[in-house]
Curated annotation (Swiss-Prot):
The gene is trpC. HAMAP family: IGPS_B. It is an enzyme of class 4 (lyase). It catalyses: 1-(2-carboxyphenylamino)-1-deoxy-D-ribulose 5-phosphate + H(+) = (1S,2R)-1-C-(indol-3-yl)glycerol 3-phosphate + CO2 + H2O. It holds the Pfam family IGPS. GO terms for biological process: L-tryptophan biosynthetic process. This is Indole-3-glycerol phosphate synthase. Its EC number is 4.1.1.48. GO terms for molecular function: indole-3-glycerol-phosphate synthase activity; phosphoribosylanthranilate isomerase activity.
Length: 250
């Protein structure tokens, strides 16, 4: 599935038209996660659909969802901008950024400098770079470009060998462990436990996907995660405020 998405991205990049730059201040994604509202930082995801689950939220108003997340004390937001596979839009991110005061991560499949520039222009405070989608040297180049523009970067891996190859090139500030295998789309929070021991000191560790309960939060926190990225389990609820409070057992 990842290979199919990357091929689609390569086609899309050929026709990118860069928008005007969104004139909203940059916010520190990293600092928000370093100073969370609860025992573990929460990146709450604004997501309409996914390839594995199909349509997740039929009545989808990104600004309302984002405002609910902020009211429930999420620390940062993630917005899906991929159109073909996740029914996202770049405009969703810009709209969310203009609605809330939280830092916003652009969740997409970024493989080219043009997408980094596009992310900056639509207002992203941080971008996602996927270890399984790029050679470590390519990932490092895009990482540096994003940092030079004042954006944070969440470097995501699923597999320990991918992490080891990246660490031979550089050490990211923020490292995400994707508990979902992007080849099979199966999830297991034990993936965080498995890979966390390889994460160097000084990396802010984020556990992503498959997190749906207080027990999951406590498990990944115990194994070194300082923050989590949660999407589907929050988006499926009628009230995103209640969903966050339920996740934390409040």
């Amino acid at each position: 599935m990842l290979d199919q998405i990357i091929q689609q991205k390569k086609e899309e990049i050929k026709s990118i038209v860069l928008p005007e730059t969104c004139q909203i201040e940059r916010r520190s994604f990293k600092k928000a996660l370093q100073n969370p509202n609860r025992f573990i930082g929460l990146i709450a995801e604004v997501k309409k659909a996914s390839p594995s689950k199909g349509l997740i939220k039929e009545h989808f108003v990104p600004e309302t969802i984002a405002a609910d997340y902020e009211a429930a004390k999420a620390d940062a937001l993630s917005v899906l901008t991929d159109t073909r596979f996740f029914q996202g839009r770049n405009q969703f991110l810009t709209d969310v950024k203009q609605t809330v005061s939280l830092p916003v991560l652009r969740k997409d499949f970024i493989i080219d400098s043009l997408q980094v520039e596009e992310s900056f222009r639509i207002g992203a405070d941080a971008i996602l770079l996927i270890g399984e989608a790029l050679e470590p040297s390519e990932l490092h180049e895009l990482y540096l470009e994003a940092r030079e523009k004042g954006m944070d970067v969440l470097v995501e891996v699923h597999d320990e060998t991918v992490l080891e190859r990246i660490l031979q090139v550089f050490q990211p500030d923020i490292l995400g462990i994707n508990n979902r295998d992007l080849k099979t789309f199966r999830t297991s929070v034990s993936q965080t436990e498995k890979i966390a021991q390889l994460v160097p000191d000084g990396c802010l560790l984020v556990s992503e996907s498959g997190i749906g309960s207080l027990a999951d939060l406590q498990f990944v926190n115990k194994h070194g995660a300082q923050a989590v990225l949660v999407g589907e389990s929050l988006m499926r609820e009628d009230s995103q405020q209640k969903a966050i409070r339920g996740l934390f057992g409040e």
